[in-house]
Amino acid sequence: MANNRTLARRRRAFSPLTVVMLAVTLVAFMGVPLSSTGAADAADPVESVEANRRGYTSYGEPPVAVGTSEEYVNSSELAGSRDKGNAEAEEEAAEVETDVQPSSVTIDTEERAAPSQVQVQQERMEEADDAPKPVPVRSAVPSTVAKRQQARHRVIGTAVIAAVVAALLWKFSRRRSGAPREGGENENGGEEK
């Protein structure tokens, strides 16, 4: 009967523990390349959104519009369309001015000349938003010290994982092969002869 149990154990190639160990090893080794790509050093998405809103790329350079050139901007077609738009805007402004009656407007000339504090603050905020601001730029290429540290961590992590896997596989292979266990007991629970 004991002989049948031993044969049944030997036939079973993968025990649940072996499958779990292989899965953990696979995940650990897949994690090493992912962590070595420097994913943690990638630019913060919030920073890139702020930089784009200010008109700068994540590298601190102003964005380059694709397909535009000075020739196109200065072309007669574009200038002509601008003139048409300005002429229409001036006509509308003239119509609006004629619609307003002087008796309905009762603003002192002093109030009209001095801008309010709110207007001054709004103008300052607009000027501050329009001014190009230096964007903190993270280096796209990691320094040699960072590369060495990544390589060292990768080697240490791989060595630790390999040592743990080797120790577990050695322990379970000895147990499966019928080698005597510690304490001199065999698989049947009796003393070895």
Curated annotation (Swiss-Prot):
Give the organism, scientific name. Neospora caninum
* Keywords for this protein: Glycoprotein, Membrane, Transmembrane, Transmembrane helix
Q: What InterPro entries would the database entry show?
A: Gra6_protein
Q: What is this protein called?
A: Dense granule protein 2
Comp. bias regions, Acidic residues: 88-98
User: According to the record, which residues are glycosylated?
Assistant: 4, 74
The record's region (Disordered) falls at 75-140, 174-193
Q: Which domain of life is it from?
A: Eukaryota
Q: List the transmembrane segments.
A: 14-34, 153-173
Topological relation to the membrane, as annotated: Multi-pass membrane protein
Q: Name one GO cellular component term.
A: membrane
Q: Which family does it belong to?
A: Belongs to the Gra6 family.
What is this protein's gene name? DG2
Q: Where in the cell is it found?
A: Membrane
Is Cell wall biogenesis/degradation included in the keywords of this UniProt record? no
tRNA processing: present as a keyword of the record? no
